[in-house]
From Swiss-Prot:
The gene is csn8. GO terms for biological process: COP9 signalosome assembly; protein deneddylation. It comes from Xenopus tropicalis (Western clawed frog). The keyword Nucleus applies. It comes from the Eukaryota. Pfam families: CSN8_PSD8_EIF3K. It is found in: Cytoplasm; Nucleus. Residues 8-181 form the PCI domain. This is COP9 signalosome complex subunit 8. Gene3D superfamilies: 1.25.40.990.
Amino acid sequence: MPVAVMAQNPVSFQRLQEQCEEQELEAPGGIANPQVYSQLLALYLLHNDMNNARYLWKRIPPAIKSAHSELGGIWEVGQKIWQRDFPGIYTSISACQWSEAIQPVMEAVRDATRRRAFGLVSQAYTSISADDFAAFVGLSVEEAVKGVIEQGWQADLATRMVMPKKPDSAPLSLIPNEQQLARLTDYVAFLEN
C-alpha cells in the first residue's frame, strides 16, 4: 500500500488527509502502516481536529505506538495543543527529529499555532509584555517584536510591552428586505407542505 504523497500547501494537506483516511480504512486487517498513522495524526493536529486526533490515537495498536517513537512525539504535541500550552507546543515540535514525511506537516502545525496565538492575543489583550508574547508565539523577543511591527501592532521597547491591533470585524452582510421576505415565504411554504 503506497504512502500518501507529500503536501506543501493547505489544499494539498487536505487532500493528503483524505488519502490517509482512505488508506486507514482500506488497510488489510484494519491496521494501516505507521507512516499513515503518523501523517494522519499530524494532519488532524494541523487542522485543529482534536476529537479525530484523540480517537485515532486510541485506534492505533499499542505495538505500533511503542515501536515508532515519532507517533509518541506527535501525540505529545497533540496533548500540548489540547492543554493550550502554547510554549509547550513549540518546545515539543522542536524537540523531535521528524521524518521527511512528517517534517513539513509539523512545520505547518507550528506556523498555524503561531497564527492562532497572534489572533488570540489580538482579540484578548490591549497590551502584553514582550516576554510573555514571545513565549506565547514561540519566538525570541526580538523576532516577536519584529513580527508585531509587521502586523501593524505597536511595541514599546522602553516598557517592553506589545499593544496588539484589534482585528477588523467582518462586515455584516445585509440581505435586502425582498430577499428576506422571499426566504421567509419559501420557509413557510415548505413547512405547510
